[in-house]
A protein has these predicted regions:
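Active-site Tyr-X1-5-Lys
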Residues: 85-86, 98-126, 151-153
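Conserved Rossmann-fold NAD(P)-dependent oxidoreductase catalytic core, especially the SDR/UDP-sugar
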Residues: 29, 35, 61-102
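Short-chain dehydrogenase/reductase
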Residues: 51-53, 95, 100-111, 141-145, ...
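Glycine/proline-rich active-site loop of Rossmann-fold NAD(P)-dependent oxidoreductases
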Residues: 108, 133-146, 155, 160, ...
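N-terminal Rossmann/SDR dinucleotide-binding element
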Residues: 1-32
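Short alpha-helical oligomerization interface
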Residues: 42-59, 91-99
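Flexible, glycine-rich beta-alpha linker
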Residues: 83-84, 98-102, 126-143
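Short alpha-helix in the Rossmann-fold core of NAD(P)-dependent oxidoreductases
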Residues: 38, 48, 53-60, 64-67, ...
Length: 199
């Protein structure tokens, strides 16, 4: 409803279907493509690697080929999960990636493929690494949502591990503002950004 109210055209198709995506993009001729198609949760990725590969890398392959044909600025949504466990108290874009599990590993592999398209085809890109999104319309059952639901329902809040792990939460409106800045600023081309709250 929100998209319709703002006159944003919605086309529903499977991003794994190359011909359907090509036909759609030929109608739009995009200057910018924001690639969001993927399995969106680490637990799901670890439970079903086959589907994760298909939904993450097949969709990216199609998107890259289409972006290349229009020389579109590709904005690829990666994840802070590419860092794995890190020793530093703060993570920067220069922190060495050492992903754990299927989700982080596939996100990092996809980043390398995006960069390869830039090297071989001069495709402009920006990689965004958000962390722990929360906010309106979030239905992915991430840790923040689970904690709030349990608190409201009077249930226990369980913290995994020894309690020393840190997670930088990102409010959805802040992420949207960051995306807009990436689109509007040519200095964002061929760069990687951690889009998080920063604490």
């Amino acid at each position: 409803d929100l998209l319709h109210k703002n006159n944003i055209q919605i086309n529903v198709d499977d991003a794994r279907h190359y011909n359907a995506m090509t036909g759609l993009m030929n109608m739009i001729e995009p200057d910018v493509i924001i690639h969001l198609a993927a399995v969106s949760h680490a637990n799901k990725a670890n439970k079903d690697p086959h589907t994760t590969f298909d939904h993450s890398l097949r969709t990216l392959e199609n998107t890259l080929d289409i972006a290349r044909s229009f020389n579109s600025h590709l904005i690829y949504f990666s994840s802070s999960m590419v860092y794995g466990h890190f020793k530093e108290s703060n993570v920067t874009e220069e922190t060495i990636c050492n992903p754990l599990g299927m989700y982080g590993s596939l996100k990092y592999a996809a980043e390398l493929i995006v960069k390869a398209y830039n090297q071989v085809f001069d495709l402009p890109y920006t990689i965004i690494r958000p962390s722990a999104l929360y906010g309106e319309r979030c239905v992915s059952r991430r840790v923040g949502q689970i904690f709030i639901e349990n608190a409201v329902q009077g249930k226990d809040i369980t913290v995994q591990g020894d309690g020393n792990d840190k997670l930088d939460f990102t409010y959805i409106e802040d992420l949207i503002q960051g995306i807009n800045l990436v689109i509007e600023n040519k200095n964002s081309l061929n760069q990687t950004f951690n889009l998080t709250f920063g604490e």
